[in-house]
């Protein structure tokens, strides 16, 4: 039997666009979509290499799912592959966010759009839970990884430990005791023939070395593209403020949008006065329900900053400027770091360190799943504090039967009827719209 051919660049483009269009619901759901597409369905990438790349991306500032797409795209087709995968992960969501920002600024909230996205969120919740179970089963082999995953979950969900400390702690534990992770972590692979990318790398031992110089050049260009608007627009009123503020955000967004949301809200609302607190919450709601990384909430803030200064045209300019200074460094980090990380793929201590991060990632995904699930299923969630501990608890009286019904529908479509991802999301969105017309 002839083995399947390595995917062409054109074929990869179609898949990266598909991932960009289907990546609703934040990083946990987006990573789940990517894993299903490139690992489960197409066998382009092995579990081991996917988790190895994810572990590195978790250490970087910026949206880890977008950086993971860039990393995998680079591995498959070099710099052009990384640029294509990373851009196609951003562009669909950015286009939707721009359109919704214009609608919001000119017309206010649109109930029909909210109903469609409500159905999508319920389906995405099912995807997140499925991804959590799948990754845990394959990544956690032995007592130590399970304990580390549980510790990471408790640190984030109960004790509000900053995300970078959780990841760095897991990295240190894995580095110090690589033997404790020998049976799992990013070295665990599913039995069967090697994935297409892994087979290609095995057949060309110098593949990474040949790709590295171009990646380094692309990384340096990415840094220049990131910094030139900051220098060029310095002192240029709102445009200089947008370039400077969001370029700072690009290097402190460890843990995704939620980790820096309070700071962004404080500065954008109280210091720059680009928008009000309710508008900030509306922007987060839009970012949660559009494809692409949640950090697109910054695009909404940039749009309103430009809109308040120069109308819709200014809003579009502010939106594009925000996107540029937010995402250009994300490409730079990957192109500069990925060749080194790939060369160290089999170094025992680095392998152990990244396996420790893999275990912590399971706890991170569990925390994101809990956060997302509570806010989808319940209309009201209370934050309870007791000494150093704090936890989100739902107001059980505010349970939303429609959300439970839509999540159940998505589970049946995915697991019982074996619907594809796109069809499941489309049916769920339509069901959410239909439910909005019922007198519930």
Model feature map: region roles:
Residues 1-60, 64, 71-290, 294-440:
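Multi-pass membrane proteins that catalyze or facilitate reactions on polyprenyl-/lipid-phosphate substrates
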């Amino acid at each position: 039997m002839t083995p399947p051919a390595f995917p062409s660049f054109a074929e990869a483009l179609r898949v990266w666009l598909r991932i960009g269009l289907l990546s609703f619901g934040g990083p946990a759901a987006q990573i789940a979509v990517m894993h299903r597409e490139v690992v489960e369905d197409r066998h382009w990438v092995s579990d081991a290499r996917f988790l190895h790349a994810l572990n590195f991306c978790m250490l970087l500032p910026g949206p880890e799912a977008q950086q993971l797409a860039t990393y995998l795209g680079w591995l498959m087709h070099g710099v052009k592959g990384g640029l294509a995968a990373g851009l196609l992960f951003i562009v669909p969501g950015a286009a939707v966010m721009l359109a919704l920002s214009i609608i919001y600024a000119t017309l206010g909230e649109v109930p029909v759009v909210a109903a469609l996205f409500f159905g999508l969120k319920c389906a995405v919740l099912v995807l997140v839970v499925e991804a959590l179970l799948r990754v845990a089963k394959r990544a956690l082999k032995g007592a130590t990884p399970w304990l580390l995953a549980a510790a990471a979950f408790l640190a984030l969900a109960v004790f509000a430990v900053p995300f970078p400390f959780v990841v760095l702690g897991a990295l240190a534990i894995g580095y110090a005791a690589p033997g404790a992770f020998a049976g799992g972590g990013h070295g665990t692979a599913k039995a069967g023939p090697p994935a297409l990318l892994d087979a290609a790398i095995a057949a060309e031992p110098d593949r990474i070395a040949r790709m590295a110089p171009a990646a380094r050049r692309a990384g340096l260009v990415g840094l220049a593209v990131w910094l030139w608007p900051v220098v060029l627009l310095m002192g240029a009123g709102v445009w200089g403020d947008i370039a400077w503020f969001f370029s700072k955000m690009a290097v402190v967004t460890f843990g995704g949008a939620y980790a820096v949301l309070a700071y962004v809200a404080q500065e954008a609302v109280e210091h720059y006065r680009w928008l009000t607190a309710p508008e900030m919450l509306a922007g987060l709601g839009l970012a949660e329900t559009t494809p692409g990384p949640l950090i697109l909430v910054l695009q909404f803030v940039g749009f309103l900053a430009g809109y308040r200064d120069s109308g819709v045209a200014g809003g579009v300019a502010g939106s594009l400027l925000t996107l540029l200074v937010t995402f250009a460094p994300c490409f730079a980090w990957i192109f500069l770091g990925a060749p080194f990380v790939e060369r160290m793929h089999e170094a025992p201590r680095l392998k152990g360190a990244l396996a420790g991060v893999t275990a912590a990632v399971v706890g991170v995904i569990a925390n994101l799943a809990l956060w997302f699930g509570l806010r989808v299923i319940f209309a009201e969630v209370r934050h309870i504090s007791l000494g150093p501990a704090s936890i989100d608890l739902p107001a059980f009286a505010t349970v939303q039967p429609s959300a439970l019904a839509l999540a159940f529908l998505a589970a049946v479509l995915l697991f019982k009827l074996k619907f594809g991802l796109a069809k499941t999301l489309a049916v769920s969105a339509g069901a959410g719209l239909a439910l909005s017309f019922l007198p519930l």
